[in-house]
Curated annotation (Swiss-Prot):
Organism from which the protein derives: Methanosarcina barkeri (strain Fusaro / DSM 804)
Subcellular location(s) of the protein: Cytoplasm
Quaternary context: The 20S proteasome core is composed of 14 alpha and 14 beta subunits that assemble into four stacked heptameric rings, resulting in a barrel-shaped structure. The two inner rings, each composed of seven catalytic beta subunits, are sandwiched by two outer rings, each composed of seven alpha subunits. The catalytic chamber with the active sites is on the inside of the barrel. Has a gated structure, the ends of the cylinder being occluded by the N-termini of the alpha-subunits. Is capped at one or both ends by the proteasome regulatory ATPase, PAN.
Regulation of catalytic or functional activity: The formation of the proteasomal ATPase PAN-20S proteasome complex, via the docking of the C-termini of PAN into the intersubunit pockets in the alpha-rings, triggers opening of the gate for substrate entry. Interconversion between the open-gate and close-gate conformations leads to a dynamic regulation of the 20S proteasome proteolysis activity.
Entry-linked Gene3D superfamilies: Glutamine Phosphoribosylpyrophosphate, subunit 1, domain 1
Family listed: Belongs to the peptidase T1A family.
Name of the protein this chain belongs to: Proteasome subunit alpha
Length: 249
């Protein structure tokens, strides 16, 4: 029986394949691609995070599923991939943020915390006896009156975006953003754009109970999650928009 080309190279995290690939890292990325769709958008007056929690059973309490987390007063994170891995990284980020406050008496920078998380992820691609984190994070916040949005990859790679998505619906969401995103839009418009993209990615199968929204405003530099009533208001606007479009057709 002929062995597959990657046999022997996909078992150990520290072994490169002949064409320079780390298969375990690629498999970790696949875990993210199968996760819930998370969206981040920079606006003129802040930054927005949205997640479609994709409830798979009507018996599950939607409130028990959390995909957007507060890291510090001015920083939030949205996750996709393995839930337990994400929770571990969020806890680590929170500790790093508090250590920075105690050590330097100032809030940690969004880019700094993102790099620390990526540095930690990278070590789990380099040593034997461990596996990569099967999760990606979108880290959003405000630095020096500027909105910041970073994506942390399972490999430890770090990229800053104006708008992006992770998870199962990434390609569909990014396609919407490339066509409709504007840097001068406010947070209201950014939330509506993000929800519209999630609506299209889910082919209309979403409602307020499955959506989580977090924002950081330039005005107060505080992270907060929208309450269900606020989310419902935005959802109704999206549903009405698509209903009008269908009626015209």
């Amino acid at each position: 029986m002929q062995m597959a080309p990657q046999m022997g190279y996909d078992r150990a995290i520290t072994v490169f394949s002949p064409d320079g690939r780390l298969f375990q890292v690629e498999y970790a990325r696949e875990a993210v691609k199968r996760g819930t769709t998370a969206v981040g958008i920079k606006a003129a007056d802040g930054v927005v995070l949205l997640v479609d929690k994709r409830i798979t059973s009507r018996l599950v309490e939607a409130e028990s599923i959390e995909k957007i987390f507060q890291i510090d007063d001015h920083i939030g994170a949205a996750t996709s991939g393995l839930v337990a891995d994400a929770r571990s990284l969020v806890d680590r980020a929170r500790v790093e943020a508090q250590v920075n406050r105690v050590s330097y008496d100032e809030p940690i920078g969004v880019e700094v915390i993102s790099k620390k998380i990526c540095d930690h992820k990278q070590t789990y691609t380099q040593y034997g006896g461990v596996r990569p984190y099967g999760t990606a994070l979108l880290i959003a916040g405000v630095d020096d009156n500027l909105p910041r949005l970073f994506e942390t990859d399972p490999s430890g790679a770090l990229l800053e975006y104006k708008a992006t998505a992770i998870g199962a619906g990434r390609n569909a969401v990014v396609e919407v953003f490339e066509a409709e995103y504007r840097q001068d839009m406010n947070m209201d418009a950014a939330i509506l754009l993000g929800m519209d993209a999630l609506y299209r990615a889910a082919e209309g199968k979403f409602d307020a109970s499955t959506l989580e929204v977090g924002i950081v405003s330039l005005q107060d530099k505080k992270f907060r999650k929208l309450v269900p009533e606020e989310v419902e208001n935005y959802v109704q606007q999206i549903l009405e928009k698509h209903k009008e479009t269908e009626n015209k057709e």
